[in-house]
Amino acid sequence: MNLKDLINRAVVSAKNGSKKLRILQVQILGGDIRESVEHFEPYGFTSEIHPGAEAVAISLGGDRDQTLAIVVTDRRYRPTGLKDGEVCIFDDLGRKIFLSRDGIKVEG
């Protein structure tokens, strides 16, 4: 087993959110395209990601045919400037629910 094949950065190129687990097509760093990659989300939270979002892809046992995505993020839309301990739920249109040091703020 090659350890460098266990954990990889990937870019989402297509997705299907109609299943119980979202199915992704990702391009792993180095150009390898993986189909039918399951995206595991935390219980109680979900979002419909855009192609171009970035993922941390794990290949079980180093086998890229057994790849799953455990974290998907999209730096194009992520708010910045939060203070330590603050939390923000956000979307691609700039709407936010912001748990700030001054209280809860809803924008948009």
Question: For each predicted feature, which ranges?
Answer:
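Intrinsic low-complexity, repeat-rich intrinsically disordered segments enriched
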Residues: 103-108
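Exposed beta-strand/loop interface patches that mediate assembly or binding
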Residues: 1-99
